[in-house]
Amino acid sequence: MGSLSPWHWAILAVVVIVLFGAKKLPDAARSLGKSMRIFKSEMREMQSETKAEPSAIETNTANPTPVQSQRIDPAAATGQDQTEARPA
């Protein structure tokens, strides 16, 4: 009961052929193959990019730029009193 016997696989294959038709199965397999090739090439490209990026990341984080904080008063920036800016 744990695994499928050869008869189960044969019945499953017949059902798939009946449902999808003999003509559509090669097209579907071809499309699946193309999709897998594209997926694998994209994965290889991503892996090569991640191998190249760590050196660039390490050099950028070695020299952080200091940031000066400033407090800006909204009333002084607009030139209005805070009571005038409130809705009536």
Curated annotation (Swiss-Prot):
Record-linked Pfam families: TatA_B_E
Protein name, entry field: Sec-independent protein translocase protein TatA
Comp. bias (Basic and acidic residues): 43-52
Bias kind Polar residues: ranges: 57-71
Location (main, coarse): membrane
Family indicated by similarity: Belongs to the TatA/E family.
Lineage: superkingdom: Bacteria
Start and end residues of each stretch annotated as Disordered: 43-88
Topology term for the membrane: Single-pass membrane protein
Function: Part of the twin-arginine translocation (Tat) system that transports large folded proteins containing a characteristic twin-arginine motif in their signal peptide across membranes. TatA could form the protein-conducting channel of the Tat system.
GO biological process, one term: protein transport by the Tat complex
MF term (GO), any: protein transmembrane transporter activity
Keywords attached to this entry: Cell membrane, Membrane, Protein transport, Translocation, Transmembrane, Transmembrane helix, Transport
A cellular component annotation (GO) from this entry: TAT protein transport complex
Location(s) in or outside the cell: Cell membrane
Entry's transmembrane regions: 1-21
UniProt subunit comment: The Tat system comprises two distinct complexes: a TatABC complex, containing multiple copies of TatA, TatB and TatC subunits, and a separate TatA complex, containing only TatA subunits. Substrates initially bind to the TatABC complex, which probably triggers association of the separate TatA complex to form the active translocon.
The UniProt record lists the keyword Transport: yes
Gene name linked to the record: tatA
Alphabetical list of InterPro entries matching this protein: TatA/B/E, TatA/E
